[in-house]
Amino acid sequence: AEAEGLYLQVEPVSTYAKPGYYMTTSDSAADIIRVVGSPNVKLLYDIYHMQLMEGDLVNTLRRNADIIGYIHIGDVPGRHEPGTGEINYPYLKHVLVDELGFDGIFAFELSPLTTMDACLEAMHAF
């Protein structure tokens, strides 16, 4: 991937979504990424999965900021749009963008709680 200028994203996933999955925390993925040692292998940090599996989102984001390349957004419970669950998305956005200087990709991977228009509005507000 590195020789071709491509990037690989390593995504830990919750056992709620994939029972028996072997890589379920940001640190387990980070260990693999750091052993590989390529700047083109990054952590895909899925906020929904990591809240379910480890919580403490701010500290895990800070600890792994140097290798995060992509972020999936979905609130808990239900994997709905930001603001519908327990995650403080305005604060996470502040930590990621203002404090850590994250300039990677944010992707909304969710199921709209109400209408698509309401979901799009929440996405724009983010």
Question: Could you tell me what each predicted segment is?
Answer:
Residues 14-21:
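Surface-exposed cleft-lining segments at the edges of enzyme active sites
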